[in-house]
């Protein structure tokens, strides 16, 4: 495969298997670099990036946590009434909700830590949740945008479920901007 462009960028999850990682490296003719979006935002999103763009890997890491991207006045519709169990405010996942669902969807995040990777979710109880003043609530679409370092309301104009999915499928803007700096 020959690429005649000035630069290319390919991304995949850091949890991918070694066989796939090597296959991509062989196809693209370069090894991946590892960057976690948590170095640039309040979201842990470990990824491999393959690129022919020289990337500075010695950079100042962001100390931003979930609390820094939260809205101050959130509509009551985002709050849950399910009982909380295992509350421990010293942990990143500081509580779980008592309802039927996959364990990942029961997790309540401490706002003083970074949140785990955003995933595609269309609604229901699948959005990331935060513990605020003794209550659990789902993150808002605006907060999802902020975790991806998008401008506020960038995904506005479509249903909330689509906004969550778009953010879960997207790249973290500040990571991509950092990678592309060398092209400026």
Explain the meaning of each model-derived region:
Residues 11-12:
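Walker B catalytic acidic pair
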């Amino acid at each position: 495969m020959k690429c005649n462009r000035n630069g290319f960028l390919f991304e995949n999850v850091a949890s991918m298997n070694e066989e796939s990682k090597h296959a991509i490296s062989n196809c693209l003719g370069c090894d991946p670099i590892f960057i976690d979006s948590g170095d640039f935002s309040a979201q842990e999103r470990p990824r491999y990036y393959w690129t022919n763009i020289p990337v500075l890997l010695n950079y100042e890491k962001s100390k931003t946590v979930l609390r820094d991207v939260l809205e101050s006045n959130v509509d009551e519709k985002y709050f849950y009434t399910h009982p909380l169990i295992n509350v421990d405010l010293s942990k990143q996942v500081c509580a779980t909700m008592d309802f039927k669902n996959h364990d990942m969807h029961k997790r309540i995040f401490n706002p003083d830590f970074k949140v785990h990777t955003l995933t595609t979710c269309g609604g229901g109880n699948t959005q990331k949740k935060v513990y605020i003043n003794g209550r659990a609530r789902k993150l808002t679409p605006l907060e999802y945008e902020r975790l991806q370092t998008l401008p506020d309301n960038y995904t506005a104009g479509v249903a909330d479920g689509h906004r969550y999915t778009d953010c879960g499928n997207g790249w973290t803007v500040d990571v991509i901007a950092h990678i592309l700096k060398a092209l400026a």
